[in-house]
């Protein structure tokens, strides 16, 4: 079974794409490029089309077979796509963590558990797991145009960005997928007051954590998201 466009879109929503080779951590031997493709050399550059094509190849050659081996033909397309996204992010948890045989109820109970990194719960992982669960639970016969990742509702929230000393430095607004710098007090008032009926929650994160969760670089001085 192959991942659908909905599955690819879900993965792209939570994975950053970089068209120049980089090392996420300095001790890795090879470089990473595109949508997290590992194994290229320093100085490699790709086009967006190359990155998109390689993502599909990587998923269907490596991660989709993991899910196929687990579900044994019992999953529908949305269930399959959600589990592929989980595998792409967390690896072959079905084998590594000894998952019980596939059933909808069992998998729905397991997906939200993968929200920790470094011994801490990360809100970015919480949001990704919820997006996967929403898709997993969505009937394949649905013709709704609602957003698959949010059940049709864009869930906005504000983020207080802290510098390395823990001091509030900048404000951001996010829908759980992308992040935007709140540049002026007027913009902040718009989010807090004029949109008060949305009852936006407020999260507090170090700016380095924001960069890690959304795969973006932030200028510490200006707060701009690059």
UniProtKB/Swiss-Prot annotation:
Gene Ontology CC annotations of this record: host cell cytoplasm
| Catalytic residues (UniProt) | 15
Q: Where in the cell is it found?
A: Host cytoplasm
> What keywords appear on the UniProt entry?
Antimicrobial, Bacteriolytic enzyme, Cytolysis, Glycosidase, Host cell lysis by virus, Host cytoplasm, Hydrolase, Viral release from host cell
Q: Which Pfam families match?
A: Phage_lysozyme
Q: What reactions does this protein catalyze?
A: Hydrolysis of (1->4)-beta-linkages between N-acetylmuramic acid and N-acetyl-D-glucosamine residues in a peptidoglycan and between N-acetyl-D-glucosamine residues in chitodextrins
- Record EC number: 3.2.1.17
GO terms, biological process: cell wall macromolecule catabolic process; defense response to bacterium; peptidoglycan catabolic process; viral release from host cell by cytolysis
Question: Recorded GO terms, molecular function?
Answer: lysozyme activity
Report the superkingdom from the record: Viruses
- What does this protein do, in the record's words? Endolysin with lysozyme activity that degrades host peptidoglycans and participates with the holin and spanin proteins in the sequential events which lead to the programmed host cell lysis releasing the mature viral particles. Once the holin has permeabilized the host cell membrane, the endolysin can reach the periplasm and break down the peptidoglycan layer.
Q: Remarks, anything else?
A: The bacteriophage lysin is a powerful lytic agent with a narrow target specifically for dairy lactic streptococci.
The family line of this record is: Belongs to the glycosyl hydrolase 24 family.
Tell me the protein's name: Endolysin
Question: From which source organism is this entry?
Answer: Lactococcus phage c2
The primary gene name is L3
């Amino acid at each position: 079974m192959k991942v659908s466009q909905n599955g690819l879109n879900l993965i792209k929503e939570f994975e950053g794409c970089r068209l120049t080779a980089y090392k996420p951590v300095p001790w890795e031997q090879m470089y990473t490029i595109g949508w997290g493709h590992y194994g290229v050399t320093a100085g490699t550059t790709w086009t967006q089309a190359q990155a998109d094509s390689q993502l599909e190849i990587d998923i269907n050659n490596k991660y989709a077979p993991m899910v196929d081996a687990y579900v044994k033909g019992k999953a529908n397309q949305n269930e399959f796509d959600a589990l592929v996204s989980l595998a792409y992010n967390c690896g072959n948890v079905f084998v590594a963590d000894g998952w019980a045989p596939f059933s909808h109820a069992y998998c729905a109970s397991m997906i939200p558990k993968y929200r920790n990194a470094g011994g801490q719960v990360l809100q970015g992982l919480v949001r990704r797991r919820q997006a996967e669960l929403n898709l997993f639970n969505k009937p394949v016969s649905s013709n709704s145009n609602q957003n698959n990742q949010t059940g049709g509702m864009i869930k906005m929230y504000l983020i207080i960005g802290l510098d390395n000393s823990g001091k509030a430095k900048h404000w951001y607004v996010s829908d759980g997928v992308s992040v935007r710098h709140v540049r002026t007090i007027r913009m902040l008032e718009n989010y807090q007051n004029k949109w008060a009926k949305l009852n936006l929650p407020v999260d507090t994160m170090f700016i380095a954590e924001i960069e890690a969760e959304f795969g973006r670089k932030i200028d510490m001085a200006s707060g701009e998201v690059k």
